[in-house]
Amino acid sequence: MMMKIVFKGKSSEYEIQRSCFCVDAFVIKDKIEERDGVDFITSNVDLLEFSDDSFTFEEIVKHFNICDTEDMIIVEDFDMKSNKDNQNQEDDIEHNILKSEKIIHENTKQTSMQFKNLKFFSRIFKNENFLSDFKESKQEVVTIKKHEKLEIFKNLSQEDQEISFVKIEILNYDSNEDSLSFNLDIFPSGMSYKYGILKGSMHIILQGKTSSTMLFPFLKSMIYKNKSENSSEKIFTLMINQKKHYKLIANLS
């Protein structure tokens, strides 16, 4: 059975932002106060229905993954075998044939048929309604030898601020070949810790309340190691208070 969420307004009246806590999930917020409010959408939802158009969960997630500069445009396929609007499509074809005109070309005296164009429809979700995950900050690229330890946040610059949320992500993580260690003795007080490995990525989340002077020494204690004999690339990202703070690309050769 299809799971559908119905919104009262048009699609242009909502903002969508990728979730910081869950892969392939997003938050949708109504720009109009005291109407639909805020919803957390996961893959349990199949369809988002607005007053003007409908979009599937997969269409929205795909837009986040492949594009962040253009409008999301979905062109409906014309498929006579499809049950959707099948009768309307048949009517269009019949109308097209009935309204066709016979044209006799003066030069060649050949006869041709001119058909009226069929109607195709697009669904558009404006890109301006997709909020950026974060603004790019400092990025570095390093090359290390296989089996060599990497101090991930060694060059991390500290900024004085109160911190309530931290997310560390390691892309291309293989639990059989990769390992991560840190000094729990300097774990920032006031924070809780959880982690998970999903779809080739490790996610570490710290939540609570602490200061940068407590957090950064712990981050700098993080050491990554790889025991694979193959060359690879690992990407480490650090998000602090919902904003991207640092990105490190490590080439293992």
Curated annotation (Swiss-Prot):
Pfam families: DUF5416. This is Uncharacterized protein Cj0990c.
